[in-house]
Structures are given as structure tokens and as C-alpha cells.
């Protein structure tokens, strides 16, 4: 029991990992714990639009665990492609450390879910990636492009980096977002 409690206390640190997008109506940045919670709710709400049927519980588990490595590494904006490989290695070490607090059975399950998400090969992982890539778009569309403007993000970057992942896991959501992104481009929300 104590090792599980130690893990639960460790993941509380996700609440202090600041992301680049602001929650609607607030002037502060969201944190990774809020992000993971919102993704779990998105799966519950949007799973019927998945490209193929998915195991909803498995997908939710994946998303509540997918960013725990950020406790050690911090969050990096998805458009920071030049450091992506280095970040993957650092995050793997962090996830291994954090999951290493758990009993072997849970450690292996959680590491497996994290690895499945990172590989993005299963239907659940593809849908999870679609949710993960779409929520910053949804928030930016509601915030007049707040983090796009603050971070010098171009329309082409948003389409190129997010479109394939969202379309692969949730084509209907990508069709909706693409239309809204085109409107945002017309409104001048990108650099």
C-alpha cells in the first residue's frame, strides 16, 4: 500500500507542471494534471466518433498517465520539433522512475500503457493522440489563438503537426477543427 501512496503523492506534482495554453476565462496557464483530466473527459464524450471502435477505459488510462514524465522534464510545446528525440529519451527515464515507485504488476501495466501511447499504433493510442493534439486547438480557438500568438505559431505548423494525428484517430473531429482553423487563419490568429 505504501508504495502506491508514494506514487500517488509523486504524481500530485503534475499539478505544478505549467503548459502553454490558458484555461478558458483564466489568466494563468493550465497545468498537466488539468490537461490529463480534460482529455479523459474528451474520450468519454467523443469516443463514438473514433475512426474504429476503441476500449474507452484503456484509452482513458492511457491519457491520465501519458504526461507523468513531465514531472521531471516539464512540458514542451508540440511545435518544438528540434528537441523531440531528446525529450522522448528524458521522458522515458522519468516515467520509468515514477512508475518504479509502484509494485511490479502496476508498474508494468502503467509503463505498458505509456509505451502504447507513445507508439501510437493501436486504435486506442491513435484516438488518445487525436484527443491530446486537439485540445490545445480547441482552447486556442476559444482564446483567439492565445498560445499560437504568444509562441509565434503558424497555421501550417498547426495543420502539419496535428492534422494527421487527429484525422487518424477521430476523422470527424479533424473535419470540424480544420474548418475552424481555416476561419482562425482568416481572422489573423496566426503569425
Please report, for each region that a protein language model flagged, where it lies by residue:
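Alpha-helical, largely C-terminal catalytic domains
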Residues: 1-191
Amino acid at each position: 500500500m505504501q508504495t502506491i501512496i508514494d506514487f500517488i503523492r509523486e504524481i500530485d506534482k503534475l499539478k505544478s507542471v505549467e503548459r502553454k495554453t490558458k484555461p478558458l476565462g483564466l489568466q494563468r496557464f493550465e497545468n498537466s494534471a488539468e490537461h490529463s483530466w480534460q482529455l479523459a473527459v474528451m474520450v468519454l464524450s467523443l469516443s463514438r466518433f473514433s475512426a474504429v471502435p476503441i476500449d474507452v477505459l484503456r484509452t482513458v488510462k492511457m491519457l491520465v498517465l501519458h504526461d507523468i514524465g513531465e514531472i521531471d522534464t516539464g512540458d514542451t510545446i508540440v511545435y518544438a520539433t528540434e528537441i523531440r528525440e531528446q525529450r522522448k529519451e528524458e521522458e522515458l527515464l522519468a516515467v520509468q522512475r515514477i512508475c518504479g515507485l509502484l509494485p511490479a504488476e502496476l508498474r508494468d501495466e502503467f509503463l505498458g500503457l505509456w509505451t502504447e501511447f507513445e507508439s501510437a499504433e493501436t486504435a486506442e493510442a491513435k484516438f488518445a493522440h487525436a484527443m491530446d493534439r486537439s485540445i490545445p486547438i480547441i482552447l486556442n480557438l476559444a482564446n483567439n489563438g492565445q498560445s499560437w500568438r504568444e509562441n509565434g505559431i503558424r497555421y501550417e505548423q498547426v495543420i502539419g503537426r496535428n492534422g494527421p494525428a487527429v484525422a487518424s484517430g477521430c476523422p470527424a473531429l479533424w473535419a470540424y477543427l480544420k474548418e475552424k482553423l481555416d476561419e482562425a487563419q482568416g481572422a489573423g490568429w496566426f503569425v
